[in-house]
Amino acid sequence: MARAIKGLAILALLVGSGAFVACSSDGDNASNPTPTNDGGPGGNDDGGPSGNNDGGNGGPFTPPADPGPGGFWVTVSGEDLASVGYDWTSSSLADGDPPGFVDGWAVTFEHVIVTVDKIRVNADPDKDEGNPQDVGAVVASADGPFAVDATIGGNVVGKSGSPDEKTVPIAAFSKQSNGQAFDPATRYAFSYDLVAAAANAKIVNLDAAGLVLYEEAKQKGWSMIYAGTATYKGPAPAGGSVFEKIPTQVKFKLGLKNPSSYINCQNTDLTATGDEFPRGIQANASKSTTVQITIHTDHGFWDKLNVEGTPLHFDPIAANASTYGTPSSPGTVTIEDLVNVDVTGFKTKSGETLPARSLVSDYTAPAGQLKFDTNGTSFAQANSFAAYLAYSAASGGHMNSDGECEVKNNFTP
């Protein structure tokens, strides 16, 4: 599977009106950094071809060709998990690769749609080691926005090498915006934004159903969409329990308002120093270098915020499905159904207490009611599950599979 690097804690750092989420091995909260040059857009010269048909307003988009030796080819991937999903068997593990949902659910996606914008390549990724958001000047950039379905993907081999990882190119840089070649001996900072669905988005690979979803996303301001089906595969629940009332198949549509910037990402294609990978991308004089924007779909289902790799749960979503109480009837859940669900004490759609449970061998569920840990994060609507999901999923933007980025949340949770 695509991912084996885990255990980094995510730190929430507030800068002005945006929240920064950084990654650290010690889990300590860092102090607020000073305002920085975060590699934001510095002009529209893309430094090379980035597709010759803009695909705006629902039109066709031509993915850019390989830019050739010395260039950077930017792709988007949801890993193989966006394509094949998360299976569940009696041998599934919370800490498996991929992780299993601890409550017995297999989850597959029909659509994982994101809108990518403001791709930028900057000089000097190590300008300030204490404040990685501070980078050098923009040397190449590409503006979208690009509407991408990571479940559909494209024809470029993903970083995992798995045939199920489908990745699609959205931009290419053959040279710097000043016409000079990228220096193969130099690393360049790489950053990108995930933004709200936009009317002028370049439609990269959405199918008919994806286009319908994207229209809804434009109306509602979603920047991420997780849409799919969850199927319960665990053992039969105890008679009379609330679990017996949960439908065994649930179709979900989770539209998330969580636009964020992913700044100066670490690069797991390069050699680590200790536990830390270098930041930035590096050209190869003999061939192009693929730079993969990677969306980790597991982040949206974690049970604790600002910490990497906590257990995955689907029970609190399924327990609020439309057919709760008639388990043989497939149910549906939308993000609107979860707005008033309190993560500090989950209840079913009918108001019953939802207990915590574990159906995997490497995780012990706490006694009593299922609760998620906001870990110091507050929400405009206190403890809203919809807001929790959006905030947690926003931490899922990476580079080259597992490269951690400095994450600036451009939204109020």
Where are these predicted regions, by residue range?
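Ser/Thr-rich, Pro/Gly/Ala-heavy low-complexity intrinsically disordered linkers and tails
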Residues: 20-66
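Sec-dependent bacterial lipoprotein signal peptides
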Residues: 1-22
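Alpha-helical transmembrane segments and their juxtamembrane interfaces
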Residues: 16, 40, 127-128
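A short, solvent-exposed, low-complexity linear motif enriched for acidic/polar residues
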Residues: 58-413
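Intrinsically disordered, low-complexity sequence elements enriched in Ser/Thr/Gly/Pro
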Residues: 1-4, 33, 39, 46, ...
